[in-house]
Amino acid sequence: MAPRKAKVQKEEVQVQLGPQVRDGEIVFGVAHIYASFNDTFVHVTDLSGRETIARVTGGMKVKADRDEASPYAAMLAAQDVAEKCKTLGITALHIKLRATGGNKTKTPGPGAQSALRALARSSMKIGRIEDVTPIPSDSTRRKGGRRGRRL
């Protein structure tokens, strides 16, 4: 009879979703905040912008359609995103703020300010803040006709 072979114990590899970092090291992500007058999106990616880390909208946080773009819904969305980022090890964010743009309004919606404040207050460090609203050099004709929108 052949001698028994000793059982080899396999080492369990712990899988981490976030980046491999030391304690106290600052890891940056990019928060894309799109604030229109109908909804607010808070979308966090890695620095390249390819990998989505978390994406929450104002509409996911409130029941009524009229409240989707409200500052309160944007604040809840930003707090959710910050919580997810912390669990994955992201401690700091660069912010790219965007309004509708194009041939529509270039003003960010009501949720932009409160989303940014909520990210800052949830102990996330803020790096650069940039406005990435698409502004045309020469646009197509805006809706409303020759005489404009009549109220």
UniProtKB/Swiss-Prot annotation:
UniProt keyword Ribonucleoprotein present: yes
Pfam short name (any one): Ribosomal_S11
Annotated Gene Ontology cellular component terms: cytosolic ribosome; cytosolic small ribosomal subunit
Keyword terms, alphabetized: Ribonucleoprotein, Ribosomal protein
Bias kind Basic residues: ranges: 142-151
PROSITE patterns, per the entry: RIBOSOMAL_S11
InterPro entries in UniProt: Ribosomal_uS11, Ribosomal_uS11_CS, Ribosomal_uS11_sf
Keyword Ribonucleoprotein: yes
One GO molecular-function entry: structural constituent of ribosome
Sequence segments annotated as region (Disordered): 131-151
GO BP, sorted A to Z: cytoplasmic translation; ribosomal small subunit assembly; translation
Family indicated by similarity: Belongs to the universal ribosomal protein uS11 family.
Name of this protein: Small ribosomal subunit protein uS11A
Organism: Drosophila melanogaster
Gene that encodes the chain: RpS14a
